[in-house]
Curated annotation (Swiss-Prot):
Domain (Protein kinase): residue spans on this chain: 524-802
Species annotation: Arabidopsis thaliana
Identification of the protein by name: G-type lectin S-receptor-like serine/threonine-protein kinase SRK
Domain EGF-like: 293-329
Domain of life of the native organism: Eukaryota
One Gene Ontology cellular component annotation held by this UniProt entry: plasma membrane
């Protein structure tokens, strides 16, 4: 007995120590991964459920304010990253809430015992159930017996929020009547359902769509046996194994990672972009390895029917062989809304098929699919169906199999450099150079000669009429009245739709006779052409008194040219600023519409920045810094100091002109819009502008504001510093645009890496390189191109930052449309914190057209 007393003493000591240890350190108590029918989880207890391997954690949380949610996040990751939220649309309004099992259902109750959320299971009620958090992040409800552990009564994987985890399925479960899809958060701090969804459409051949307000934004393309046809990168993901299942019971996509110790997720962010992340343990941050949409061609139906998008061409939209623009003038100016139409009408039974290679095939929601036949039978099936317009294989494995045929219009196709799919488009035989019969040739010859005679007569009459007009020595009667009728009676239309000017207000703008313009430009001689714009040609001219002018002759055929003419005359005639181009007069004669500007000797900024000529040597750093300041002051005048609050909407290097002293002047106000003083933003069904300069919210959702111009200014600043275009910029070994390249260098403390070599050329006597000014401009440029509009500074702040050498400047966040493989900042990495760098949440609006140049 004596020998046992010391052992008992040690046992008592151990239990006393353990008791006090657990009291003093409750957070270090053993975590559980289950919740039984007799247990509960409350906000006040601050307890959580942890998966067996400590990978995931479930508990109550809040981000801002008094709204509480039940969610799941990664346990071992320092950055709180939420992957599932139970009551996302029914938050608890105060810190009194409880999760428990009631009647074989999981329920969340508020302080009045009201059901805030429930699993809503019906039918036979089991006597004993238990909830469990698994190591794959799945929160399940199952029977409490050991042999029932694999039978889930309910699981969170069937009800995703904004994130898809490995082993989680996205798509339809026909057997259980489930449709699993992800929905964005409403904002960075609000987990409730946002405006964007990524879900499966099973009409035709199953494929995923990105939606906003049930309007398609982008499309994955159908599964072709190896990958989704619009996501070629899938075959390059060595660390991920993906699977697509299509049978009577389900149509679903899922993935898993090869390294079971690594973390990966697929998340739709607050602006609708689908992003793939992989956790980097050494860097302790999320690495974004993929996202969609990644470029303009990913936007759904961007080029309209019978056209394809190709990022390697300019313009990016191209009519398919055998088709032509309905309005060539509009198409050439960048307006692709006029659609493509057939050059030659089809003749059923005689038509042939043209092969388009390396394509993302059109949307299949209205297509007919037959997986039992091959390509040859598919061609015959399409040929005998007179309304069939195209066909392709449904599966590209083993030489191809299956058949898709499109009836009527098809849209949303793009061309890849390689690895795309073959699409066969139905064309008239004449498009292949088929020989016509003798009778057909004779008929064609007769018709052709007749048309030539008629056309010659019309041209002769037109020439005589023009000659008569050219001899006139005075403007026609009512010349000023006609201009007033064209311009003034329409008024200046503000973004709200209200007319700013009425018939009683007269334009204080000199009018020039057409004959004077003809003489000044030497009858619009080609030798006097300064440039060609989207709506016409600009000529250099000299008046009789020796004054040099720039003459903008708008296209006679373009209705947009007329609209631009009206808008520019109404706006710029009332604006006076040293950094805005000055409109001297205008001229309207017959169908001619002409604007006359001051002539600026040094031309446009882009000719100095991007063309390898001697003119680029004029741009030492002091000149560039002066240009940046001048553009900023001009924009500030438009946004704040002018009579009207004006949004330019097309600020770019080619729309900044330089006088003999290299003073910058903003030009081309044809796309500008006027705001009320208390108006902050507006939206449009027709997005106009230039790719590379458009802000994300404007390009994708049609929302524009002063912050849209700020974004364009930021792009322009980085182009001035680097001497490189944002659009078309490619860095060796990377897939970034200029914004992404600048951002990566800035994060690594290598901001000066992007600077134009001409600026730092020590051998140049003109070089006055100031590194601190350059870095300040790069930082300001990055602030201006931040993804969220609300994060961008106003132009008043930009002017102040440019002029202050000692003032503290905020650190920028990730830019909008940052292309390429990149690692997110620590502050931008989780589903809660990562959203801080995302764009402003947008309203549910309709964007029917993007008209960019």
């Amino acid at each position: 007995m004596r020998g046992e007393l010391p052992n008992k003493h040690h046992s008592y000591t151990f239990f006393v120590f353990l008791f006090f240890f657990l009291i003093l350190f409750p957070d270090l108590s053993i975590s559980v991964n289950t919740l039984s029918a007799t247990e509960s989880l409350t906000i006040s207890s601050n307890k959580t459920i942890v998966s067996p391997g400590g990978v995931f954690e479930l508990g109550f949380f809040r981000i801002l304010g008094d709204s509480w949610y039940l969610g799941i996040w990664y346990k071992k990751i320092s950055q709180r990253t939420y992957v599932w939220v139970a009551n996302r649309d029914t938050p608890l309004s105060n810190p009194i809430g409880i999760l428990k099992i009631s009647n074989a259902n999981l329920v969340i109750l508020d302080n009045s015992d009201t059901h805030v959320w429930s699993t809503n299971l019906t039918g036979a009620v089991r006597s004993s159930v238990v909830a469990e958090l698994l190591d794959n992040g799945n929160f399940v409800l199952r029977g409490s017996k050991i042999n029932e552990s694999d039978e889930f009564l309910w699981q969170s994987f069937d009800f995703p929020t904004d994130t898809l985890l490995p082993q989680m399925k996205l798509g339809r479960d026909h057997k259980r009547g489930l449709n699993r899809f992800v929905t964005s958060w409403k904002s960075s701090f609000d987990p409730s359902s946002g405006s964007f969804m990524f879900k499966l459409e099973t009409l035709g051949l199953p494929e995923f769509f990105g939606f906003t307000s049930f309007l398609e934004v982008y499309r994955s393309g159908p599964w072709d046996g190896l990958r989704f046809s619009g996501i070629l990168e899938m075959q390059q993901w060595d660390d991920i194994i993906y699977n697509f299942t299509e049978n009577r019971e389900e149509v679903a996509y899922t993935f898993r990672v090869t390294d079971h110790n690594s973390y990966s997720r697929l998340t739709i962010n607050t602006v609708g972009r689908l992003e793939g992340f992989m956790w980097e343990p050494t860097q302790q941050e999320w690495n974004m390895f993929w996202f969609m949409p990644k470029d303009t061609c990913d936007l759904y139906g961007i080029c309209g029917p019978y056209a394809y998008c190709d990022m390697s061409t300019s313009p990016t939209c191209n009519c398919i062989k055998g088709f032509q623009p309905l309005s060539p003038q509009d198409w050439a100016s960048g307006d692709v809304t006029g659609r493509c139409r057939r050059k030659t009408q089809l003749t059923c039974g005689e038509d042939r098929f043209f092969r388009l290679m390396n394509m993302k095939i059109p949307a299949t929601t209205a297509a007919i699919v037959d997986k039992r036949i091959g390509l040859k039978e598919c061609e015959e099936k399409c040929k005998t169906h007179c309304n069939c317009t195209a066909y392709a294989n449904s599966d590209i494995r083993n030489g191809g199999s299956g058949c898709i045929i499109w009836i009527g219009e098809f849209r949303d196709i793009r061309n890849y450099a390689a690895d795309g799919q073959d699409l066969f488009v139905r064309l008239a035989a004449a498009e292949f150079g088929e020989r016509r019969t003798i009778r057909g040739k004779i008929i064609g010859l007769i018709i052709g000669i007749s048309l030539m005679l008629v056309l010659s007569f019309i041209i002769y009459c037109f020439w005589k009429k023009k000659q008569k007009r050219a001899r006139a020595t005075a403007a026609p009667i009512g010349y000023r009245d006609r201009i007033q009728e064209l311009i003034i009676t329409n008024g200046v239309v503000m973004s709200s739709g209200r007319r700013l000017l009425g018939e009683e207000e007269d334009l204080e703008l000199p009018l020039t006779e057409f004959e004077t313009v003809v003489m000044a430009t030497e009858n619009f001689s080609d030798s006097n052409i300064l440039g060609r714009g989207g709506f016409g040609i600009v000529y250099k001219g000299r008046l009789l008194d020796g004054q040099e002018i720039a003459v903008k002759r708008l296209s006679e055929m373009s209705s947009q040219g007329t609209n631009e003419f009206k808008n520019e005359v109404r706006l710029i005639a009332r604006l006076q600023h040293i950094n805005l181009v000055r409109l001297l007069s205008c001229c309207i004669y017959a169908d001619e519409k002409i604007l006359i500007y001051e002539y600026l000797e040094n031309g446009s900024l882009d000719s100095h920045l991007f063309e390898t000529t001697q003119s680029s040597n004029k741009l030492n750093w002091q000149t560039r810094f002066s240009i940046i300041n001048g553009i900023a002051r001009g924009l500030l005048y438009l946004h704040q100091d002018s009579r009207f609050k004006i949004i330019h909407r097309d600020l770019k290097a080619s729309n900044v002109l330089l006088d003999k002293n290299m003073t910058p002047k903003i030009s081309d106000f044809g796309m500008a819009r006027i705001f009320e003083r208390d108006e902050t933003e507006a939206n449009t069904r027709k997005v106009v502008g230039t790719y590379g300069y458009m802000s994300p919210e404007y390009a994708m959702e049609g929302i524009f504001s002063v912050k849209s111009d700020v974004f364009s200014f930021g792009v322009l600043v980085l182009e001035i510093v680097s001497g490189k275009r944002n659009r078309g910029f490619h860095n060796s070994g990377q897939d970034n645009n200029l914004l992404g390249y600048t951002w990566e260098n800035w994060k690594e403390g290598k901001g000066l890496e992007i600077v134009d070599s001409i600026i730092v050329d020590s051998s140049s006597s003109m070089s006055l390189f100031q590194p601190h000014e350059v870095l300040r401009c790069i930082q300001i440029g990055l602030l201006c191109v931040q993804e969220r509009a609300e994060d961008r500074p106003k132009m008043s702040s930009v002017v102040l930052m440019l002029g202050s050498e000692k003032g503290e400047i905020p650190q920028p966040k990730r830019p909008g449309y940052c292309v390429g493989r990149s690692s997110l900042d620590t502050a931008d990495s989780s589903s809660s914190t990562k959203r801080d760098s995302e764009s402003l949440t947008v309203n549910q609006i309709t964007v029917s057209v993007i008209n960019a140049r």
